[in-house]
């Protein structure tokens, strides 16, 4: 193959990927973590500043530590302000770069041009990956994806170099950067060991049998990478624990977690072939997973695993690809439950490549040297890629705004309280309080332990001038999440509108004890104290509010009246 052909293949790959994802440039932000990580974070909104850079390396955010990802958002804010097209364009470019690096890495590792291109094209065009590209908050996926693919390419160079140390250091550095984007790369050393098995052939003898001495030597080479992964795991667990993201066994018992993990693994496998019912959030099934579904999932996984084991010598790509797929998914299968989702499409962003690798090389091996099969395989691959591209373009449009995203989630999932709550927020902003309340009623039934279901319904009822009903909902929200300042602020407003000024004061003082730098808390406390006739205390509270945020004109006027 000439030099020009790989370059031409890369250009075509990039062009087709951009074409499939081009609608993303018309999408806005979604207020589901985009606000948590970007829109409501002053350090990000201000762009690249010395204080912001220091902040990104020294603080948790959303139960995560991903300074490289936050720096990328800061650069976007510096370049584009808060224009969503700029943020989406950066994510798309990173995704294209990851696909090109994967193509280059596989081509260098295997020397097989067409299969390498097909694997990279599936990675670039598969609709399971839309969530990672079209969601600004998922920037950590595409950024860590670039690092992961760059590490594969650098490792391929390490294997062929006469002086491998510089390339080994490059792999270490790229992995470290990737871990600062997302801790998903903790499994990278294991993937590199699999590549030592196939296609590098470093772990086996001429018959394809694994040689323990060679395995031990390859493992020892990667001890620095395993140490880096261990350190990143410690940091990740600390961040998740500090952010309250780790779920207790009482909430999700071990048996439930294992059932969920098995079903999630089967779902990721099946959706690789038939990517339907894609949604931003997949809830745990109400009442648990039926036994027959768990049995089918176990049967599927055992069948694939047995086949890969049986073919491990004469067709090692099956075992390598399957272990890559399963191994990279293990940290996100829910055995250590983080968050509320049963599974998420974005978790398959890097693992799926292992499964696709096995399938494509299996098809390549079956067709090679048989012209009729080669033509059939080429037609099948072309048709599959075209279908994936069209499906991806359609899925990108689902992410155009909050309403589209959560209406779609409710159409393709069942009993989804998160989708009900977030769609209710959209409707409430549009003044459709009755429709919003209907969704919040459903959410409170599906998830009676959700503070958001009760608290947001209380806020909606408060906005529709029903303070007594709002108060009852917000009391439940505070009981479920007593550390949340938002619910105490809402409850204080409900108490004030109901004329319960003493109760409002209690809630505001409790909220200020948790967050003394919230201007709106001081402001409302000042107004409540003024209503109670406590002029001096009211003036102090209003002054504190204006010290933190001097902009609100009505507060200046009210303070002047009290003076």
Model-identified regions with their sequence ranges:
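Polytopic membrane enzymes that build or remodel cell-surface glycoconjugates and lipids
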Residues: 1-459, 463, 479, 486
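C-terminal luminal/periplasmic domains and tails of membrane-associated envelope-modifying transferases
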Residues: 1, 403-563
């Amino acid at each position: 193959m000439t030099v020009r052909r790989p370059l031409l293949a890369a250009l075509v790959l990039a062009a087709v990927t951009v074409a499939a994802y081009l609608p993303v440039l018309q999408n806005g932000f979604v207020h589901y973590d985009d606000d948590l990580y970007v829109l409501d974070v002053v350090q990000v909104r201000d762009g690249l500043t010395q204080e912001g850079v220091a902040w990104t390396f020294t603080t948790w955010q959303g139960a995560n530590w991903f300074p490289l990802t936050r720096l990328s958002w800061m650069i976007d804010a510096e370049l584009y302000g808060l224009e969503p097209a700029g943020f989406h364009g950066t994510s798309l470019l990173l995704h294209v770069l990851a696909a090109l690096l994967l193509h280059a890495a596989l081509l260098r590792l295997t020397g097989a041009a067409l299969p390498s291109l097909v694997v990279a094209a599936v990675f670039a065009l598969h609709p399971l990956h839309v969530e990672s590209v079209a969601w600004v908050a998922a920037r950590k996926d595409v950024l860590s994806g670039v690092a992961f693919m760059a590490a594969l390419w650098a490792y391929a160079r390490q294997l062929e170099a006469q002086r491998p140390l510089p390339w080994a250091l490059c792999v270490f550095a790229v992995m470290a950067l990737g871990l600062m984007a997302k801790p998903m790369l903790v499994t990278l050393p294991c993937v590199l060991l699999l590549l030592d098995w196939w296609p590098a052939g470093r772990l086996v003898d001429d018959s394809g049998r694994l040689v323990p001495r060679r395995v031990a030597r390859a493992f020892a080479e990667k001890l620095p990478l395993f140490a880096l992964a261990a350190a990143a795991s410690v940091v990740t667990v600390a961040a998740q624990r500090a952010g309250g993201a780790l779920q207790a066994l009482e909430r999700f018992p071990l048996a439930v977690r294992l059932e969920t993990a098995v079903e999630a693994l089967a779902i990721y496998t099946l959706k690789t072939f038939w990517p339907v019912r894609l949604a931003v959030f997949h809830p745990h099934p109400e009442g648990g997973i039926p036994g027959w579904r768990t049995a089918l999932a176990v049967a599927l996984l055992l069948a694939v695993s047995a086949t890969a084991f049986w073919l491990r010598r004469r067709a090692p790509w099956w075992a390598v690809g399957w272990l890559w797929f399963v191994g990279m998914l293990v940290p996100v299968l829910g055995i250590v439950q983080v968050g509320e989702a049963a599974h998420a499409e974005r978790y398959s962003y890097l693992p799926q490549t292992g499964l696709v690798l096995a399938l494509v090389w299996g098809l390549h091996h079956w067709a090679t040297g048989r012209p009729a099969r080669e033509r059939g395989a080429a037609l099948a691959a072309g048709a599959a890629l075209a279908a994936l591209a069209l499906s991806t373009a359609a899925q990108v449009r689902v992410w155009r705004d909050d309403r589209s995203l959560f209406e779609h989630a409710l159409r393709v999932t069942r009993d989804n309280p998160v989708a009900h709550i977030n769609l209710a927020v959209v409707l409430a902003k549009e003044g459709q309080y009755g429709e919003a309340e209907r969704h919040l009623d459903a959410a409170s039934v599906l998830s009676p332990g959700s503070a958001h279901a009760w608290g947001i319904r209380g806020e909606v009822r408060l906005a529709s001038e029903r303070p007594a009903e709002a108060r009852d909902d917000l009391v439940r929200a505070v009981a479920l999440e007593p550390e949340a300042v938002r619910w105490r602020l809402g409850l204080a407003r409900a108490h004030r509108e109901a004329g319960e000024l003493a109760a409002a004061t209690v809630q505001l003082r409790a909220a200020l004890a948790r967050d003394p730098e919230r201007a709106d808390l001081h402001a409302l406390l000042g107004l409540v104290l003024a209503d109670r006739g406590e002029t001096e205390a009211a003036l102090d509270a209003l002054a504190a509010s204006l010290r933190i945020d001097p902009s609100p004109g009505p507060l200046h006027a009210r303070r002047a009246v009290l003076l």
